[in-house]
Amino acid sequence: MARSIKKGPFVDTHLQAKVQAEGPSSKKVIKTWSRRSTITPDFIGLTFAVHNGRKFIPVFVTENMVGHKMGEFAPTRTFFGHAADKKSKLKKK
């Protein structure tokens, strides 16, 4: 179920304070563990280092990202592909 419009988007207060302190066109990377925060128009043009559980992934915010969550752009799992079928390889030889 989607979040109610009357509540507005969720942004951690400490993250919002960091964004307002930096200014609109800052080159400094803002480190955050807040994957749950929604990207607002204030974040456009800023670079965030979003934690994925192991390391910080740099995320440059563009207009298309507004309304999405920070965590969507820092994947937590690495997909190595499906295991190959060993039986079919043995029959071919």
From Swiss-Prot:
Keyword Ribosomal protein among record annotations: yes
Domain of life of the organism encoding this protein: Bacteria
Keyword match rRNA-binding: yes
A molecular-function term among this protein's GO annotations: rRNA binding
UniProt GO BP: ribosomal small subunit assembly; translation
SUPFAM superfamilies, sorted: Ribosomal protein S19
UniProt keyword list: Ribonucleoprotein, Ribosomal protein, RNA-binding, rRNA-binding
InterPro entries: Ribosomal_uS19, Ribosomal_uS19_bac-type, Ribosomal_uS19_SF
Transmembrane segments: none
A cellular-component GO term for this protein: cytoplasm
Family: Belongs to the universal ribosomal protein uS19 family.
Chain's role: Protein S19 forms a complex with S13 that binds strongly to the 16S ribosomal RNA.
Protein name per Swiss-Prot or TrEMBL: Small ribosomal subunit protein uS19
Source species of the chain: Geotalea uraniireducens (strain Rf4)
Gene symbol of the encoding locus: rpsS
